[in-house]
């Protein structure tokens, strides 16, 4: 693939030209363009009058000298109206059954069939062969047809368990369109003077027949990396577990892979990337219910697994758990231990401070911060005399939170290990230790693991940033993925500060 980034830029400019004068149809144009560039079919679902036919007409201008055919199906439509009339002369003179196909579907590169589900069996059967094999049986001859894009449209879905399902399954991309929603776009649409049938594409951007044929071969050379296949298989397994998931044929999966290859190719990449998998949201649904379900499952895949978000959070959880274990071990070693005094006749157990604690004011560190009296507290200052009296006689004990202000009443106790423990209103406790006896900062083991995890996170974020330049993926999906990665990064940084 020569100059992949130049090709990606050209396709982006081509799409922008095709989108001119069409409001809130950028995604539809881009996916129809991708379908045309990879030889696939598109189904547009939506009410009348929302530019479905105009989208198909625009795609003709993506190619030099492309021929277009469009037809509105009715229940009375005949094969002659779609595939061409019979040649009376050939039948009369030579007894040959032959159609005159000039100007009809068999000789068109871009085909638009409106109200597709109203077509009769004779049309549907011939259409299936045309889509599957790009061939048309004209009498005794089997002719290759040049169709690059079939756009079928309707305001309804095919009935379940009908003869239409075979044709519906051949339509790889399925788009559900609606009226223009944004107020500014609606106004622009009403006041636009642009002739919708004018060619908006500069000749320099149009695709030649030679380019198209060459690209078909190069699309097939785009690789599918193992980690991307694993994501696809994960999605397939998850869908198989869901009772309401739509049936997705092996044929549809295989055709979808070629679409992903085309997305990568026209984005300037040599391999399919996780970001390309977002296209599956427009390939795997069957009806309104499955549309929402597919989008939910792909959202989980993209925000939880595609860039190892869930895996990194699992690793972070294990690191945090290990840190807590080390903290507990350190707490047992460094906590201030008071001395238990004898006293057979005493109603209350008595204690005293260790002999090496001699300062008149003691500053004791909390092994973990607590919220006391609406303040985040990391250390408490005690008057030595007050603490000795409390250890000996009990009663009320007060200390200055973080060493400032007035001494506040505290819920202090001596645990079974003879450590001083302060508790908050929810009775969460924190062991007290003398300054210098508590470990400072993160243990080296934890620090190293967090640094490695942060390095892996940065690599994943860089990979995502490099893959974002994909014309065919909506920006809101990219935003959700970015948010999921930023959330993982924030949790890692928070753990590093503990």
UniProtKB/Swiss-Prot annotation:
Keywords of the record: ATP-binding, Chaperone, Cytoplasm, Hydrolase, Nucleotide-binding
Transmembrane intervals: none
Reactions catalysed, as given in the entry: ATP + H2O = ADP + phosphate + H(+)
Residues reported to bind ADP: 23, 49-54, 196
Compartments where located: Cytoplasm
InterPro entries, alphabetized: AAA+_ATPase, ATPase_RavA, ATPase_RavA_C, MoxR, P-loop_NTPase, RavA-like_AAA_lid, RavA_ATPases, RavA_LARA_dom
One GO cellular component, as annotated: cytoplasm
UniProt keyword Secreted, yes or no: no
Sample GO molecular function, one term: ATP binding
Ways its activity is controlled: ATPase activity is stimulated by ViaA.
Major location (coarse): cytoplasm
Coiled coil regions, renumbered to chain: none
Enzyme Commission numbers on file: 3.6.1.-
Family: Belongs to the RavA family.
NCBIfam families per record: PRK13531.1
UniProt subunit comment: Homohexamer. Interacts with ViaA.
Role description: Component of the RavA-ViaA chaperone complex, which may act on the membrane to optimize the function of some of the respiratory chains. RavA functions as an ATPase.
Name recorded for this polypeptide: Regulatory ATPase RavA
Upper taxonomic lineage: Bacteria, Pseudomonadati, Pseudomonadota, Gammaproteobacteria, Enterobacterales
Gene: ravA
């Amino acid at each position: 693939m020569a100059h992949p980034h130049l090709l990606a830029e050209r396709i982006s400019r081509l799409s922008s030209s095709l989108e001119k004068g069409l409001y809130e149809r950028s995604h539809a144009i881009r996916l129809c363009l991708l379908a045309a560039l990879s030889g696939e079919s598109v189904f547009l679902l939506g009410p009348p009058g929302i530019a479905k036919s105009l989208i198909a007409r625009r795609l003709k201008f993506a190619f030099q000298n492309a021929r277009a055919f469009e037809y509105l199906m009715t229940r009375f439509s005949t094969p002659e109206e779609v595939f061409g009339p019979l040649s009376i002369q050939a039948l009369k003179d030579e007894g040959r059954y032959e159609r005159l196909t000039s100007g009809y579907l068999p000789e068109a590169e871009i085909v638009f069939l409106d109200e597709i589900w109203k077509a009769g069996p004779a049309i549907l059967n011939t259409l299936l062969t045309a889509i599957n094999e790009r061939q048309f049986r004209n009498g005794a001859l089997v002719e290759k047809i040049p169709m690059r894009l079939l756009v079928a449209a309707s305001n309804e879905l095919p009935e379940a368990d009908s003869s239409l399902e075979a044709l519906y399954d051949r339509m790889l991309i399925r788009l559900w369109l609606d009226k223009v929603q944004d107020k500014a776009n609606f106004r622009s649409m009403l006041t636009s003077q642009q002739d919708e049938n004018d060619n908006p594409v500069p000749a320099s951007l149009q695709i030649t027949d030679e380019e198209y044929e060459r690209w078909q071969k190069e699309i097939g050379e785009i690789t599918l990396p193992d980690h991307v296949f694993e994501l696809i298989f994960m999605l397939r397994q998850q869908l198989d577990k869901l009772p309401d998931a739509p049936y997705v044929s092996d044929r549809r999966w295989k055709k979808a892979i070629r679409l992903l290859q085309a997305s990568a190719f026209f984005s300037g990449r040599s391999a399919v990337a996780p970001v390309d998998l977002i296209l599956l949201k427009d390939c795997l649904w069957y009806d309104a219910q499955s549309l929402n379900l597919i989008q939910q499952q792909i959202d989980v895949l993209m925000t939880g697994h595609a860039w190892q978000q869930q895996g990194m959070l699992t690793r972070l959880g294990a690191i945090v758990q290990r840190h807590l274990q080390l903290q507990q071990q350190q707490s047992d070693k460094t906590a201030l231990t008071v001395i238990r005094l004898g006293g057979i006749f005493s109603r209350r157990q008595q204690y005293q401070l260790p002999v090496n604690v001699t300062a008149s004011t003691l500053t004791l560190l909390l092994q973990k911060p607590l919220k006391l009296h609406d303040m985040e507290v990391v250390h408490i200052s005690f008057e030595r005399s007050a603490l000795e009296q409390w250890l000996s006689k009990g009663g009320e004990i007060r200390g200055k939170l973080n060493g400032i202000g007035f001494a506040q009443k505290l819920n202090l106790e001596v645990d079974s290990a003879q450590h001083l423990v302060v508790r908050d209103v929810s009775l969460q406790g924190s062991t007290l230790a003398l300054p210098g006896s508590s470990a400072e900062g993160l243990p080296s083991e934890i620090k190293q693991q967090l640094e490695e995890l942060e390095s892996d996170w940065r690599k994943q974020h860089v990979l995502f940033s490099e893959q974002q330049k994909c014309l065919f993926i909506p920006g809101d999906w990219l935003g959700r993925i970015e948010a999921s990665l930023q959330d993982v990064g924030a949790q890692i940084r928070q753990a590093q500060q503990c």
